Amino acid sequence: MKILRITAQGLPLFKKDLDICFYTQQRVCEEDKDSLYRLTDNYYLHAACAFIGINASGKTSVLKVISLALNIVKNEPINHVEAKSILGGAKNVTIRTYFYDKRSYVCCLETVIAAKKSKTGEYVYSILSESLWEKPIATVKSKKYLTDFTGMKPVEQRNNDEAYLSDDVSFIIAHNKKANDTVEIFSLLSYTNVNVLPFTEDIPLEVIAFLDPTIEKLCFEQTEGKTFIHLKFKDEKEIILNNAADLEQYLSSGTIKGIITFSMVKEVLHSGGYLLVDEIENHFNKEIVTTLVRFFMDSRLNKNGGTLIFTTHYPELLDEYDRNDGICIVRNRNGITAENLSYILKRNDIKKSDAYQSGFLEGTTPAYEAYMRLKKSLAASIN
């Protein structure tokens, strides 16, 4: 299963409907094909999707919507999904997830969700209604109509009388079983500010050597229900730990996050799934970040169409992209918006980092007035 597009209406934090495309919007040249994933014929998907914006612009919120939509089509109960918080207390949120399945069909799943407060004061979410549309991709005349289901009747609609289905689980579960299809999701959203290495049976030595060449050995061992961590630096004695949190005393945050991230990268490239990373530059130097992005943009390495979806503050990272349509500019001006860069910047030959930092794209640099107020406040406190 490959996600083509996600739209969302009725979200409390958003200024207008959210609309994110994962397939190419601009014309695909021969030289572009090396950094894209070929879906079929002339349809290509972005292997690395960037969401960039200043602090508090809403980048994490956009990532949460994507995570929620992915988990819905994966049959996860909404109330068990961490990203459900993006729904807030909304009474009517409509999420449409467009995807391409194993049968070579383009499908549209529309899920309408409502919040209700429980006795404990927490919101509990349930699906009010659901519909599924589908069409063979062979019947699509051009890219313009790839996700257009205008005038078509749904092939299936949710029947809430079905006792076997929990009211927060999508009825897409039946479609996925029939088509023997699913979507693999790997998320680093919960690791943005927390760096504790989870138990893993296999940490590739190549990953460790890339991140910290002084480490000779790092592995987990389980004996009689207890977990031990073996850590050895070159020319040093082996250290044995029984708590992963203690690794922070010996390894940098970047190394720990790197091991978690690159271990997931290996899984995503193998499965053709999705990796969600918030603040990709957090704890990493620029070279590690660009390496990560380039792995996904290498069509010879990324044969199965693994997709990296990330947020960043790094304008320089935009220059890794030859195209504009794999980048979204996130702004928060009385509500969050996410706009595809190809709609704002028509030419690919303009240096993207310069356009971003110059303020040419609007809402991408901190307001000058806020800067002056901060400067005056600091000056007053020093005197």
Name these PLM-found stretches.
Residues 1-2, 291-383:
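C-terminal lobe/lid and adjacent interdomain/linker elements of RecA-like ASCE P-loop ATPase modules
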Residues 6, 273-277:
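Hydrophobic positions in the central parallel beta-sheet of the AAA+
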Residues 44-50, 54, 64-115:
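Conserved P-loop NTP-binding catalytic core
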Residues 48-55, 228-266, 277-287:
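Conserved ABC ATPase signature
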Residues 112-224:
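Electropositive, glycine-dotted interaction segments
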